[in-house]
């Protein structure tokens, strides 16, 4: 049944995006952001379309749409489908969306680790279209959340903005390089699918402990440091990391940084079957920023996660997680 609802919302977004794309001669992904804003504002004037006929057709779509009554997950999933359509020609791994199954699992972890918090502040420093953040926000059980997202790509940011409005999420957006100074108060939790690769701004990297001694620094190392800096003492960070994170030439500094600044709580390897290319396979790393009343767990939660479609194996794994939480938290 949910599939039908998601499909109906997708059709509304897709039809509007195609019309706007053709009329304004812009990319589908840019048109999708405009379509999202149109549905939120419930008007078409801001589009300044050249053809009256298209304005009337969009008006008819607006009259058909009832975004105020749609479940938030329908809207998020519909946007996800439309974004995938618009990005199918973009092969850069750092511009791919975090798969739903992983987003839902990270939501489960956030709820477990932040169980005692009724109000949360959340930062995603590599927001993209916001899919991971909105997945987590939609799954927060009985918690209110103020969230912050940083994204350097203005088109992706516009899509996140359109979704935040339609999902009625309190989200502050920052259009900037996440590794430049951030004017954000420390948050309770950070979630991030780390962009992997080299950071080209050597001068900017000089401000970081985890800068390379020579040559370009790893962006994913700098993202970790920036995230820890903007987390409250005792706060948690949930990263999707490349499986080779601790094997690189720059990993010595990273290990020392972890020892000095955080407690590693969990390292969970994701099923390789999720990833098209095993070279891009990832794990989930859970850190706690050190503070006066924090201590490292007696035992780090280490696991190779089974396929998410294997329900029995996942239930067994979650039972093991519950045991770990009873002992350590």
From Swiss-Prot:
Highest taxon of the lineage: Bacteria
InterPro entries, per database record: DNA_methylase_A-5, DNA_Protect_Modify, S-AdoMet-dep_Ade-MeTrfase_prd, SAM-dependent_MTases_sf, YtxK-like_N
Molecular function GO terms recorded: DNA binding; N-methyltransferase activity
One Pfam family recorded for the sequence: N6_Mtase
Gene3D superfamilies associated with the record: 1.10.150.470, Vaccinia Virus protein VP39
Similarity comment: family membership: To type I restriction system adenine methylases.
PANTHER family: ADENINE-SPECIFIC METHYLTRANSFERASE, DNA METHYLASE ADENINE-SPECIFIC DOMAIN-CONTAINING PROTEIN
Official protein name in the record: Uncharacterized protein YtxK
Gene from which the chain derives: ytxK
